[in-house]
Amino acid sequence: LYSSAASDVYKRQEIEELASKIRKMKEDGTHLCCSIGFLTEKQALMLKEAGLDRINHNLNSSRAYYSRICSTHTFEQRVQNIKMLQRLGFEICSGGIIGMGESKEDVVDMLLELREIQPEALPINFLLPIPGTPLGDADISELTTEYCMKVLCLARLLVPQSDIRCAAGREVYFKGEEKKLLSVVDSIFASGYLTADGQGIKDTIRTITDAGFTYEIESA
């Protein structure tokens, strides 16, 4: 799994350069996933022809709450982007972030939207407030281990066909409760996230084996 995060607006040269890198990495059979924002159908086809397997495009929150966290585009635009990518044959990785001020109803609504999308992978992130950012002072008192477990269990129940993944926040909200976490999810992330450090590969493997589980590594 190789992930490349990029901006929402691309020039043809940028897509061509990315396609070239994808072709190179596919030489050893690596399963590739890119987190790349919005694409036109033509751009997506260029990446598909280069061998890209999966694209990450999170819903992030519910349809009703989305405008509270993003002003540059709409929730429906994200849904339509995902549908276009599915139509072209891409696997989809799509999930959300918990702890941005949304209600419990918003969490349920987001998961119901994801059930309609049926992504191959569904990552759940738990907010890690970063000072100086718009959510730097977010109230995360509700993000107890019990509540976070309920969210993951609900994802498992509502979207059973997806690979349920625990991403950002697992080292904080599940510290000492890793066995419970691993009993619910299919996979966890290691070695950090887009805006925060995380548990390294060796420590993550130790966490998994100490909890009595075996592991497979999806990485490049």
Predicted regions and their residues:
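Single conserved hydrophobic/aromatic residue that forms the stacking wall/gate
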Residues: 1-10
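Active-site beta-loop-alpha junctions enriched in small/polar residues
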Residues: 7-8, 35-41, 60-62, 95-101, ...
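A short acidic, helix-capping loop that chelates divalent metal ions and anchors anionic groups
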Residues: 8, 63-69, 131-136
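Canonical radical SAM enzyme core domain
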Residues: 11-54, 59-63, 98-106
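Alpha-helix-loop-beta-strand connector modules within alpha/beta enzyme cores
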Residues: 12-36, 75-93, 139-161
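Structural preference for beta-strand elements that scaffold enzyme active sites
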Residues: 31-33, 54-56, 91-93, 121, ...
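Catalytic cores of alpha/beta
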Residues: 40-47, 101-113, 172-183
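Auxiliary Fe-S-binding modules of radical SAM enzymes
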Residues: 115-220
